[in-house]
């Protein structure tokens, strides 16, 4: 019975060695100049050359103008989407201020009173910024 255990232990050890050895990455030695040359020639053919060109002042101005136009158009779209909101009630609580239940409503119509820690800390918070 001891012989079978010894054989099983040897077999398990050999299998562990094979699995570890099969997953190791083989390092290239400096003596393999042929493989290095073939790899470098393949790599140089695969990638096209990249040239870095400095932008002149005119192209910078054009890109700034385009950015400003985009910014203006996004502001116009945002202003169009806004709907007239009802005026806030006269006694109201500002955003991020304490709004315990006896306090009046929040000034921002998109804000709501949110309580934490079993209702001990309540603040007016805007949950949906696109309200």
Curated annotation (Swiss-Prot):
Q: Which cysteines are joined by disulfide bonds?
A: 92-107, 99-113, 106-124, 110-131, 115-122
Which PROSITE patterns does the record cross-reference, listed alphabetically?
A: AGOUTI_1 (PS60024), AGOUTI_2 (PS51150)
Q: Which GO terms describe its cellular component?
A: extracellular space
Q: Which UniProt keywords apply?
A: Disulfide bond, Glycoprotein, Knottin, Secreted, Signal
Record SMART domains: Agouti (SM00792)
Domain Agouti stretches: 92-131
Q: Where is this region: Disordered?
A: 58-96
Location(s) in or outside the cell: Secreted
Q: What function is annotated for this protein?
A: Involved in the regulation of melanogenesis. The binding of ASP to MC1R precludes alpha-MSH initiated signaling and thus blocks production of cAMP, leading to a down-regulation of eumelanogenesis (brown/black pigment) and thus increasing synthesis of pheomelanin (yellow/red pigment).
What is this protein's name?
Agouti-signaling protein
- Provenance organism: Rattus norvegicus (Rat)
């Amino acid at each position: 019975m001891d012989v079978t255990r010894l054989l099983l232990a040897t077999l398990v050890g050999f299998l562990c060695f094979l699995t570890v050895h099969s997953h190791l990455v083989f390092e290239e030695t400096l003596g393999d100049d042929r493989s290095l040359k073939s790899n470098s020639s393949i790599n140089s053919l695969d990638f096209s050359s990249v040239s870095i060109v400095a932008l002149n002042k005119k192209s910078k101005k054009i890109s700034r103008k385009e950015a400003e136009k985009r910014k203006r158009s996004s502001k116009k779209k945002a202003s169009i989407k806004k709907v007239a909101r009802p005026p806030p009630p006269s006694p109201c609580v500002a955003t991020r201020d304490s709004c315990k239940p006896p306090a009046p409503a929040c000034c921002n119509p998109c804000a709501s009173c949110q309580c934490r820690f079993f209702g001990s800390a309540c603040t007016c918070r805007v949950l949906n910024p696109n309200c």
